[in-house]
């Protein structure tokens, strides 16, 4: 059972992946994926070497067909000649034959339940008959694959993607976390029947709410079935730069904080070796909590992660709490008076220690800063006696997620309905460190439906950057849009254009369209699905060709790559969503 008020890794079985086992008491592993062509042996070897030198435990390559799967043996041999002996992973979509070939050459093969056994509905079958027929095909085809893996001593990752669920699962369960879990469990049951334990599971989505909900639901289902397979954690299509780091830290960090996860990948639209130090920083930050005691709370079993408490608070000042969007308070007690006029905080905590909104002193609102040790019965009575109170919950301990939960739980047990602002002081001197730490900490609570706002104190960093981060965390948790949302994949060997360059060009042209979501995807495997809630999409369709989407519908096909960004702009203008700078 997970400890919501402390840190303890979830107990999992061990999956043997070459000489680098996963799960159990082994360290949480870090990995990345190559983005060069798998048929370019030298480029693949060189890139894998850079990823390994950065600290990766595993390196994954796409194998979209049998010939790519065959070439994995040459990549493996090239790495061995250079003295690199870590396990390689093949990433398979749509081609069971490629998966079977890959088993001969690498230590682990990732398959996608959404497209491993392709079953199209048709004929005169009822929905139930079609579902059962597909289930039978999965048992037969995947069962045979599992037996091959057992015979060869290979591991399998069952990699479920929100954007590529099978037609069967979508028809029955919809585009939901439940659909992802059912898709996974169908394949896990086959592994269980064949007594195959070298299994790793991933449940990925670009939406942090969907991803974390799916992982937590899967853990519950596995525990109920006495299954304890290790988990690969990641947010797919997280993007690049600050946004990619924030979104990854919110999703991965909130699960790691509860001890969930045996290997992680931070998927960035950057060179893959850049992912590794980010993952290492995030993991090291969470693991500092290991060995520290849990926070003592009354009636811990009554803490309900899934009940949305945010809207149960009352409104203060007509803009805080209740159904109002979460706010950002900027701590300017150190005297910094620089602001980004396009992204102003809702409230400023001034150098005089008082709270201001649009330069007006908030005289009629009581801001009460409280730490864990302050939250006594007398304190609670005082809070309840004063109307228009906003509680600033300040975490000062090693485990802010557990500390905030404990304080929120105490307030909820007492029936306190004051709006709550999450606050923590960070001693970071590096902005990336702050992005990862604050996103993991505050994101975990926001994803639970708690917290009416944020205040991040980081005196050693520019206040404008800290303010920007706070808004980024609210956007990554899908609570408040303040900038253009980019859903961009990290690219892989299936991508046939320069994704990093394209992301930069699209951002330069559209970053001022702050209410839009734009998907930028390397190929069709996850593209249309993962960007399903995007307003517009840019998807690789073949060598030098791009398809453009309006929401879920492809509206322009096979556009030459050199014209595609301009045509995307024209498409946005045609639909009335363009604004001049």
UniProtKB/Swiss-Prot annotation:
One of its GO terms (molecular function) is iron ion binding. Pathway: Isoprenoid biosynthesis; isopentenyl diphosphate biosynthesis via DXP pathway; isopentenyl diphosphate from 1-deoxy-D-xylulose 5-phosphate: step 5/6. Gene3D superfamilies: Dihydropteroate synthase-like, Sulfite Reductase Hemoprotein, domain 1. One of its GO terms (biological process) is terpenoid biosynthetic process. [4Fe-4S] cluster binds at residues 489, 492, 523, 530. Its cofactor is [4Fe-4S] cluster. Keywords: 4Fe-4S, Iron, Iron-sulfur, Isoprene biosynthesis, Metal-binding, Oxidoreductase. InterPro entries: Dihydropteroate_synth-like_sf, IspG_atypical, IspG_bac-typ, NO2/SO3_Rdtase_4Fe4S_sf. It is an enzyme of class 1 (oxidoreductase). The keyword Transmembrane does not apply. It catalyses: (2E)-4-hydroxy-3-methylbut-2-enyl diphosphate + oxidized [flavodoxin] + H2O + 2 H(+) = 2-C-methyl-D-erythritol 2,4-cyclic diphosphate + reduced [flavodoxin]. Binds 1 [4Fe-4S] cluster. Its EC number is 1.17.7.3. The keyword Protein biosynthesis does not apply. Converts 2C-methyl-D-erythritol 2,4-cyclodiphosphate (ME-2,4cPP) into 1-hydroxy-2-methyl-2-(E)-butenyl 4-diphosphate. Belongs to the IspG family. This is 4-hydroxy-3-methylbut-2-en-1-yl diphosphate synthase (flavodoxin).
